[in-house]
Amino acid sequence: MVGLGACTLTGVTLIFLLLPRSLESCGHIEISPPVVRLGDPVLASCTISPNCSKLDQQAKILWRLQDEPIQPGDRQHHLPDGTQESLITLPHLNYTQAFLFCLVPWEDSVQLLDQAELHAGYPPASPSNLSCLMHLTTNSLVCQWEPGPETHLPTSFILKSFRSRADCQYQGDTIPDCVAKKRQNNCSIPRKNLLLYQYMAIWVQAENMLGSSESPKLCLDPMDVVKLEPPMLQALDIGPDVVSHQPGCLWLSWKPWKPSEYMEQECELRYQPQLKGANWTLVFHLPSSKDQFELCGLHQAPVYTLQMRCIRSSLPGFWSPWSPGLQLRPTMKAPTIRLDTWCQKKQLDPGTVSVQLFWKPTPLQEDSGQIQGYLLSWSSPDHQGQDIHLCNTTQLSCIFLLPSEAQNVTLVAYNKAGTSSPTTVVFLENEGPAVTGLHAMAQDLNTIWVDWEAPSLLPQGYLIEWEMSSPSYNNSYKSWMIEPNGNITGILLKDNINPFQLYRITVAPLYPGIVGPPVNVYTFAGERAPPHAPALHLKHVGTTWAQLEWVPEAPRLGMIPLTHYTIFWADAGDHSFSVTLNISLHDFVLKHLEPASLYHVYLMATSRAGSTNSTGLTLRTLDPSDLNIFLGILCLVLLSTTCVVTWLCCKRRGKTSFWSDVPDPAHSSLSSWLPTIMTEETFQLPSFWDSSVPSITKITELEEDKKPTHWDSESSGNGSLPALVQAYVLQGDPREISNQSQPPSRTGDQVLYGQVLESPTSPGVMQYIRSDSTQPLLGGPTPSPKSYENIWFHSRPQETFVPQPPNQEDDCVFGPPFDFPLFQGLQVHGVEEQGGF
């Protein structure tokens, strides 16, 4: 069952196949006619038998053509026998092959009753271009034709013929027909059905279901359409005496195909050198058989290809196919060339020189002979005129070793026929003036123009040499040429020039017997844009400006110089700007930018060959608020630094204003300040003793007590002394100097305060009070320093000393402070510092 709106060809066919036999026999389709011309109308009828009980007697008959929509018939009626019939006319059948279906409604779908196949096409056109050939190989007459347009219908082609006389106006015996195979446009009449040398009429008949047609009749004699087979070519072996006298010739022979030996034939020979772009050359009116044929005047090509074909002589017929190609090498003649040479020498040691010789053959005539190799030799005086072969090569260069005294070598080109005229190569010295102003420039991708200024001495010619200057290129091969005209100052190099390669070009002038010094220049073949542009770097940026910099590429050999730079920048709104800069600039400042904005910048490097862009650089200008914050932080840091420095300076100055800058004796190594032997000094205490009191005779060094002790601060008479006098009590004549020496102190030991032990004239032992002060000596009383003990001093009984008032005439109670031994080492800055005490 198939839906009414979706009934397809596959669906209805499947339903038809699955129908029961009783339902299948209910309907029947008739087509009139079943095959029509494409586009013609088709009449069809569908009948339903009255014996079909499964269908309603009033069922409506429907039609469907191929995949087109279902449609009712043109007219439906009942026949007298109760059969229902539906008629339909298809106005245009546009299918070459289609199915027509007869349907009836069945519940919610349609039921297939019957189907019929329709065919449409065209009647066959008359075949054309009928031709026949008599093949002696198959011994049959083979005819072929063109069938004409496609008919879309099965069409058969029949080759018909009959024997006749004269111009085929009289029909004789009929020859059996030849039916061509399907989709073949030829047919053969065997030899047994043919009468040679008798005319026959031949034509082709085409037939299909819509009609038939015939080609025009062809009247011929089978022997007039004979197609021969090609002859057999052979090469002849000629003796060497003939070859040497006749260079540039070929010798060959041929024989006709054996079945056609009895026929008179005329042949053609064609030959072609195996060279690019060479054409065939024809030789006409040759006989069908030749035991020896000489073909001369050939160019010195490596190999020639020869072919031959034949036709019946003086009679109608067809040319045979060309014979298979025969490859022959023409006889040679000795090369007739001029050898241009150029050499380079290198001294290996005092007795040996290495020579690299280049040469180039120049033909002296159109047919200069084939070259099979080059022979380079040297005549050594030690070998009594016998030549020493240095090189035997097919290349155009050779490297060899010679004694330093060798002056020349001999070069010849050779082949089987002989050698060319010898060329003497003289080793020239590099003397004479060189060319100046050498310049090279690429004209296009495969040519380079080279020019120069002629030297002061006009040369006979110039040697131009060029080679690739690349690490990956083999420098052993060089291209070179000799310009024989010394007046020329420029030349175009065309050979062996590859695009976009760096070339080293050398020009040397040629003088009689010498060659000038070579001059080099480098250039590229075919200029192109620089490979890359310098990379941009952001140096500084502000709110409305940005400074850019770049590093130019280092120049290289042959490098095309840049002409200028161009900087392009664009903002986020695709507003682009540009500026062109001189090639000497390496930085640039972009101005008038928007604050806090993004910009895309790139640099373009330009030469005369093109331009190349650098990689893009993206920058962002500063925001004014960010700049203010930055400046505020900077000012705050500077202010803080200034305050700290000022505070430190003021602190040091305040400390100096309270006391002098004197080291602390208790925490200093004063031993290094004192001399090794300390001079005893006489200390005086004014107004305490008279002039008869002897001076101090001995000063001992006290040791530091492990357990600190304190002097009796309540000794009698101390209260009346000044504070400074309480710290140190001295005796002796102030003008008297003791000559006794102090024992040397150890280096690094602390220098302790001294104590007077005894005096010969002293009425009693006096006790001296040590100060515990660790501060520099001041004018007022200070705390006592750490006490020190002396064993001998403590063993004596303590005595009280009552001081007297000081003499007002003295400037100091106990003289200048530097009279005290412990202050001798403080005299390091001069006497001018005494005011600090």
Curated annotation (Swiss-Prot):
The keyword Signal applies. A motif (Box 1 motif) lies at residues 658-666. It is a single-pass type I membrane protein. It is found in: Membrane. Its main location: membrane. Glycans are attached at residues 51, 94, 129, 186, 279, 392, 408, 474, 487, 582, 613. N-glycosylated. Residues 651-837 are cytoplasmic. Homodimer. The dimeric receptor binds two CSF3 molecules. Interacts with CEACAM1; down-regulates the CSF3R-STAT3 pathway through recruitment of PTPN6 that dephosphorylates CSF3R. The WSXWS motif appears to be necessary for proper protein folding and thereby efficient intracellular transport and cell-surface receptor binding. Residues 126-231, 236-331, 334-433, 434-529, 530-624 form the Fibronectin type-III domain. It comes from the Eukaryota. Keywords: Cell adhesion, Disulfide bond, Glycoprotein, Immunoglobulin domain, Membrane, Receptor, Repeat, Signal, Transmembrane, Transmembrane helix. SMART domains: FN3. Belongs to the type I cytokine receptor family. Type 2 subfamily. The gene is Csf3r. This is Granulocyte colony-stimulating factor receptor. Found in bone marrow. Residues 26-626 are extracellular. The lineage of its organism: Eukaryota, Metazoa, Chordata, Craniata, Vertebrata. It holds the Pfam family Lep_receptor_Ig. Residues 1-25 form the signal peptide.
